[in-house]
Amino acid sequence: MSWQAYVDEHLMCEIEGHHLTSAAIVGHDGAVWAQSTAFPQFKTEEMTNIMKDFDEPGFLAPTGLFLGPTKYMVIQGEPGAVIRGKKGSGGITVKKTGQALVIGIYDEPMTPGQCNMVVERLGDYLLEQGM
């Protein structure tokens, strides 16, 4: 299965009539492996800061998580494994695997829990596959 198929079929799938706004699978180096059409353009520095928060949990808390034009307030995640952010009625979930970051961005009517489930389920699967 191609990386694009993982994004299209596993991240952008419909859940209870809703789906993510955008999603991507990005290497630890910031290289995009696959993304949905609406995924924001981001700076390498933004991916570097996300990776730093996985190594040093809490790194992003004072400044927020920036991805493209959006700043998310970092909320409770799982240190070293999952970063979650909130902005208004939407947010972001980032799951770290051995080689990649699985990223999902949502807005209402999708809920934070639905986003977490979709992103973390694929991330856990990739971890099980040695990715």
Swiss-Prot record:
One of its GO terms (cellular component) is cell cortex. A motif (Involved in PIP2 interaction) lies at residues 81-97. Disulfide bonds join C13-C115. Phosphorylated by MAP kinases. SUPFAM superfamilies: Profilin (actin-binding protein). Its main location: cytoplasm. It comes from the Eukaryota. It is found in: Cytoplasm, Cytoskeleton. The modification Phosphothreonine is found at T111. GO terms for biological process: nuclear migration; regulation of actin cytoskeleton organization. Keywords: Actin-binding, Allergen, Cytoplasm, Cytoskeleton, Disulfide bond, Phosphoprotein. One of its GO terms (molecular function) is actin monomer binding. Occurs in many kinds of cells as a complex with monomeric actin in a 1:1 ratio. PANTHER family: PROFILIN, PROFILIN LP04. Binds to actin and affects the structure of the cytoskeleton. At high concentrations, profilin prevents the polymerization of actin, whereas it enhances it at low concentrations. Belongs to the profilin family. The variability of the residues taking part of IgE-binding epitopes might be responsible of the difference in cross-reactivity among olive pollen cultivars, and between distantly related pollen species, leading to a variable range of allergy reactions among atopic patients. This is Profilin-9. It comes from Zea mays (Maize).
